[in-house]
Amino acid sequence: METVDTVVWALWAMLPAYIPNNAAVLAGGGRPIDGGRTWGGRRVLGDGKTWRGTLIGTAAGTALALGLTQVTPSVSAALGTDLPTFSLRAGLGLAFGAMLGDIGASFLKRRTGRERGAAFPGLDQLDFVVGALLCAFVAAPSWFTETFTLPVLVVVVVATPVLHVVTNGIAYLLGLKNEPW
């Protein structure tokens, strides 16, 4: 696979993981997953992690995966490169895993005394990637190993933080986020 093809493949494969957290923010509100509970004097997760956001984010990412599968032949032909398709299990693994990764990061932030929205460099950019990849591997191991080769994983780990910083900066400038990270 050529370098450009690898980048396109990697970004396409990760789209169902890139969307859930954005959809969760847009869905907003609802009951916090931690129910307001504290541990060691700090919230377990905080108000930003809700059942509604988790469900809507997971549904959005899964729906996107299934939609991408429908258009993959046309997009592949237009771009002149092969692209992966997504089984329901793969899409669900990526989407739900992205949400779990973000929830895990919130837990770690609370344990280290960081408030909601506080920056945690590195973790903020890759938490959902780790969750998505782990859950996709568990949900669809054959698909995962065929889709996420070492070069593809390298692109994901390098490109995702850049995309994260750029998209969050745009969301901040548009008034959709309170912080630019």
Swiss-Prot record:
Essential cofactor(s): Mg(2+)
Residue ranges of the TM segments: 7-27, 55-75, 88-108, 126-146, 147-167
Listed EC numbers: 2.7.7.67
Cysteine-cysteine disulfides: none
GO cellular component: plasma membrane
Pathway in which the depicted protein is active: Membrane lipid metabolism; glycerophospholipid metabolism
Keywords: Cell membrane, Lipid biosynthesis, Lipid metabolism, Magnesium, Membrane, Phospholipid biosynthesis, Phospholipid metabolism, Transferase, Transmembrane, Transmembrane helix
A single GO molecular function term of this UniProt record: CDP-2,3-bis-(O-geranylgeranyl)-sn-glycerol synthase activity
Signal peptide (from-to): none
InterPro entries associated with the record: CarS (IPR032690), CarS_archaea (IPR002726)
Protein purpose: Catalyzes the formation of CDP-2,3-bis-(O-geranylgeranyl)-sn-glycerol (CDP-archaeol) from 2,3-bis-(O-geranylgeranyl)-sn-glycerol 1-phosphate (DGGGP) and CTP. This reaction is the third ether-bond-formation step in the biosynthesis of archaeal membrane lipids.
Name of this protein: CDP-archaeol synthase
Organism: Haloarcula marismortui (strain ATCC 43049 / DSM 3752 / JCM 8966 / VKM B-1809) (Halobacterium marismortui)
